[in-house]
Amino acid sequence: MGGWAAAPWRLGGCSGRGGLRGAARRWGSSRPGAGDRAATLSDLLQTSVEAEEPDAAAARRERRCPREGTVLLFPGQGSQFVGMCRGLQRYPGVRDMYRLAEKVLGYDLLSLCLEGPRDALDRTQHCQPAVFVASLAAVEKLNHLQPEVVERCVAAAGYSVGEFAALVFAGALGFAEALYAVKVRAEAMQKASEAVPSGMLSVVGRREANYKFACLEARKHCESLGIENPVCTVSNYLFPDSRVIAGHLQFLQENARKYYFKRAKMLPVSGAFHTRLMEPAVEPLAEVLKSIEIQKPLLCVYSNVDGKKYMHSKHIQKLLVKQVVSPVLWEQTMHSVYERKQGTEFPYTYEVGPGNQLGAILKQCNLKAWKQYKHVDSTMCIIAMNIFF
C-alpha cells in the first residue's frame, strides 16, 4: 500500500522504533494475510518501516496538508448498548479480539454485547471491557472500509476507559495486557462504588453558574447530616458550561435552580468516578500496570488528567493510575488536540466505538473541528457524518 509509506504514523519521535512489534502487540494475535480487502495494521506499519527512512518521512510530513491527517476519538463508559458489534464478526481481526477477550475476562463478552441483558452489560465491571473491545472493533471496521484514515492518523484521545483503547491503537499497550488492566480497573471501581453510595450528575449551567460553590455547599449539607468527609466535586469537564459533578448529590439535585443549572440529570453509573471515592481502585490498577510492558506511543495520545500528550512509558503508567481519582479534562483535551494557527485547516476526526457522545461534545467545544467529524459505529451501519447534539 504505497500511500501508507507517506503516512505520519510515527510522529512523536517513534520513527524506526520497532514499529511492527508495536502494531502486532496492538492486536495481540496473528492476523490474516494479503487476501483481505485492506491490509492489517501490522502489515501497514511494516510497510511503513521498510519503505521509508525517518528523514524522508519528516520531509513528507512537512509538506502534508493538515487536513490530510486524521484524529481518532475513543468513547468511554456509558456509550455501551445491547447489540453493539453486531455484524462486525465478518472481520477476522474482530473475531480474534473477542476470542482473546473471552480468555482474558473469563466470560463470553461478545454474547453479552449482542444479547445482554442490559443490566449486566451496564455494570461497571462489564461495560468498561465491552466499550474497550467494541472501540477497537470499530477501528478494524474503519481499517477495512477506509484504510487511508487509519494510515494517516496523527493523534488519538480516549474518554476515561477509552484512553486504554487509544493507547492500544497507538502501539503503547498490547491488546490482551490492556484488556486485563481494564478488567482489574473495572472490577475495582465497581467494588469502590458499592462501598459508598454515590453518583454522578450531568449539569449544563448558565454563564453565572458557580460549580465550585455549589459543590462546597453540598458538602456542608452532607456534613450537617452526619456524613463524614463527604465528596462533591467536578469530575468531568465536558464543554463550556457543562460539567459532571460526582459524589453525594441529593442536595444539588434538589437545589439545581439555586445554582443556575439549566439542566441536571443523574447518569446511569454505579458510583462517583474520577473522585477520591475511587481510591480503593488505585492500588490494584497500579500493580497491574507495573507488570505490563508499556512503550512510547507511535502517535500523539492525549491524557485525560492534564489534556497533554503522553511523553514516555513511565508517564503513561503514572497518569493512567492518577486518572481514576482525577477529573476528566475532556474540554481541555479537545482544545489541545485542535489547537492550531489561525487559518490552518482542521483534520478529519473519527469517533470509533459505540455512541456518538464525543462528537456531540466536540461540536460544543469546537464547531469548526466538528464540521470534519464522522462516527464509526460498532455495528455494520455505514459511517455517519456530523451527528447533531
Please annotate each region the language model reported.
Residues A134, P284, L329:
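Charged catalytic carboxylate motif
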Residues Q77-G78, F169-V324:
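Alpha/beta catalytic cores of group-transfer enzymes, especially the acyltransferase/condensing modules
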Residues G2-G13, R17, A23-E217, E345-F389:
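FabD-like malonyl-/acyl-CoA
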Residues V82-C85, Q125, L249, M278-V282, ...:
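Conserved strand-to-helix beginnings and helix N-cap segments that scaffold or border functional pockets
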Residues A57-R60, N143, E187-A188, P230-C232, ...:
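A generic local structural motif
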Residues V325-T344:
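A short, acidic, amphipathic alpha-helical segment used as a generic capping/interface helix at domain edges
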Residues N143, R257, E293, Y338-K341:
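N-terminal cationic-hydrophobic initiation segments that often serve targeting/anchoring roles
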